[in-house]
């Protein structure tokens, strides 16, 4: 039988999960030169406004596992962002910190989000002289 303390803890936790923001966008960088996740890479998120100007939304750094999972929050399905966005990955800074020469000072990946999709994952595989991207899940 569950103790009263466990039941109360479970009941108190419910509102936290109900109000937690979901994230429509995540990214991941794999450094194929080293075979490791690329940690501490600065990544900026931009949206394209109606005047065709890029507006910076956020700036984050990849975690130790090379991921950023909390880009572009929304609270309700009807509030999901849509439109054209881009991620700007500061790859030269990453390779300079490892004392490795690289060709690309940064990598920009543009993409379009739809309100119909719950989540988008935009990973890149990276080397000092090349990169690749695809729509992940």
PLM segments and residue spans:
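Beta-strand signatures of extracellular beta-sandwich domains
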Residues: 42-46, 86-88
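Short, acidic Ser/Thr/Gly-rich low-complexity loop/linker segments typical of extracellular
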Residues: 51-71
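Beta-strand-rich interaction surfaces with strong enrichment in secreted/lumenal proteins
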Residues: 57-61, 76-77, 108-112
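Short Pro-Gly-centered beta-turn/loop motif in secreted/extracellular proteins
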Residues: 69-83
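Positively charged n-region of N-terminal signal peptides that target proteins for export
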Residues: 1-7
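Feature of secretome-associated and extracellular-like proteins
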Residues: 82-137
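Beta-strand-rich domain onsets/edges
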Residues: 9-39, 47, 54, 132-133, ...
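Short beta-strand/loop motifs in extracellular/secreted proteins, especially
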Residues: 39-43, 120
């Amino acid at each position: 039988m569950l103790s009263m303390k466990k039941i109360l803890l479970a009941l108190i936790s419910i509102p936290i999960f109900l109000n937690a923001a979901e994230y429509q966008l995540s990214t991941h960088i794999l450094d194929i030169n080293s075979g490791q996740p690329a940690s501490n890479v600065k990544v900026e998120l931009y949206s394209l406004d109606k005047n065709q100007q890029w507006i910076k939304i956020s700036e984050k750094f990849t975690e130790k596992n090379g991921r950023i999972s909390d880009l572009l929050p929304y609270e309700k399905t009807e509030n999901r962002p849509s439109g054209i966005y881009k991620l700007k990955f500061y790859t030269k800074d990453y390779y300079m910190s490892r004392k490795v020469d690289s060709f690309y000072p940064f990598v920009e990946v543009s993409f379009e989000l739809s309100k119909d999709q719950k989540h988008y994952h935009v990973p890149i595989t990276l080397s000092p002289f090349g990169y690749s991207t695809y729509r992940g899940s």
